[in-house]
């Protein structure tokens, strides 16, 4: 998407790859909206750390980052032994997989890269690696490079990662096309967390219908939940919408029910980090379940927008989804930029952490929750909008 900085407008993707330096290039999302900065990860360990530490976040964005990270790790290998190369790839794969356990997209993305590598003639290394994890690749993408030597496999890895990222953008465009039909002139929408272009390679999932509706000339308004404890709604979604000229207000997380009760919200669209293909259950940022319950209570449609890589075809229950628990400090305080007018010790213009909670109290910090399928009106995918219960019936098409 386009970003305007100091009067200059430029197009950016959330994640790209510098093949010359073998580096992943990311937008440092922890600094937004106060500072726009690009960072580079020099090896797969730094790439995994960038995912874990939320320099990059959002299921589709960390999926593309994982794909690039696997290719980065593959290209860093020095040697000719395919057996040693396979062991190295396993190490890279497992480190990146462990960075954010709730999202299924990184695993699916890396399996897609492995599938692309397996297209080379006599590439049993990647055929074997494709079976090492539970999530199955949904497609085979590869470059017209054949051979079973390490250098050919490295070239295939990068080609597959690039194609995964480009396909992710195409899927977001399709999500926007299908989801825009839900947005009418004068609509007031609610979105939770950030499922915009910053959470993807470009365009976004939950925001894709908004941008498509905007391009079609429709007028609407968006409420952004602040989304404590990391405030991705207040910091990232609000920044995105401001950059694109979409009318919006940031609201406290607990204000959504009040606005629904007063008839001020017509539609809810969120993203997701994992949707179960068997049941339609949805894992997303903590607080999504609460919004879905409120929407159901007030008869408001609740939609979830996802790329195909977010669908998990293996787990049978939402209770099986691993829920990441993050550091308690995120709940006990907040990051921000001092205005210089607040209490003593807060310096103007300086990004810093301020403790809010009682000094002797501890906190619990589950980062995600699971919304049962019965609370979800529909799943917006690149192939259309489906009822949650339809996913399994359409698995041949969607998988």
Where are these regions (language model features)?
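Short, glycine-rich nucleotide/cofactor-binding loops
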Residues: 38-44, 196-200, 277-284
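Short, hydrophobic/aliphatic alpha-helical segments
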Residues: 39-55, 87, 181-189, 273, ...
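N-terminal active-site beta-alpha-beta segment that forms phosphate/nucleotide-binding
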Residues: 53-118, 149-251
């Amino acid at each position: 998407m386009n970003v305007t900085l100091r009067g200059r407008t430029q197009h950016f993707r959330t994640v790209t790859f510098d093949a010359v330096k073998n580096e992943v290039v990311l937008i440092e999302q922890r600094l937004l909206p106060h500072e726009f900065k690009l960072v580079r990860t020099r090896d797969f360990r730094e790439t995994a750390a960038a995912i874990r530490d939320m320099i990059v976040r959002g299921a589709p964005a960390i999926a593309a980052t994982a794909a690039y990270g696997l290719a980065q790790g593959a290209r860093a290998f020095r040697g000719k032994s395919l057996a040693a190369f396979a062991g190295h790839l396993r190490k890279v794969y497992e480190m990146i997989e462990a960075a954010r356990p709730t999202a299924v997209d990184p695993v699916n993305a890396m399996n897609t890269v492995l599938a692309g590598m397996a297209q080379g003639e006599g590439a049993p290394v990647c055929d074997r690696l494709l079976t090492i994890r539970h999530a199955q690749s949904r497609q085979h993408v590869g470059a017209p490079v054949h051979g079973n030597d390490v250098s050919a496999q490295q070239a295939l890895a990068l080609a597959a990662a690039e194609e995964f990222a480009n396909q992710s953008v195409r899927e977001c465009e399709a999500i926007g096309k299908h989801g825009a039909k839900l947005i009418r002139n004068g609509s007031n929408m609610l979105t939770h967390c950030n499922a915009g272009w910053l959470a993807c390679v470009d365009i976004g999932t939950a925001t894709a219908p908004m941008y498509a509706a905007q391009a079609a000339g429709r007028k609407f308004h968006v409420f952004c939940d602040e989304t404590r404890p990391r405030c991705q709604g207040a910091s990232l979604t609000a920044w995105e919408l401001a950059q694109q000229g979409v009318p919006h207000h940031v609201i406290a997380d607990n204000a959504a029910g009040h606005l629904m009760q007063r008839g001020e919200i017509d539609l809810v669209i969120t993203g997701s980090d994992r949707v179960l293909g068997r049941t339609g259950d949805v894992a997303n940022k903590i607080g999504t379940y609460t919004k879905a319950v409120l929407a159901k209570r007030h008869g408001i449609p609740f939609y979830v927008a996802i790329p195909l890589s977010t669908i998990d075809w293996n787990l049978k229950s939402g209770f099986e989804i691993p829920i990441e628990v993050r550091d308690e400090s995120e709940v006990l305080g907040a990051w921000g930029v001092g205005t210089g007018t607040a209490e003593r010790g807060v310096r103007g213009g300086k990004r810093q952490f301020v403790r809010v909670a009682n000094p002797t109290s501890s906190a619990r910090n589950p980062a995600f929750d699971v919304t049962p399928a019965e609370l979800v009106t529909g799943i917006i995918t690149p192939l259309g909008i489906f009822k949650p219960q339809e996913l399994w019936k359409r698995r041949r098409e969607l998988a």
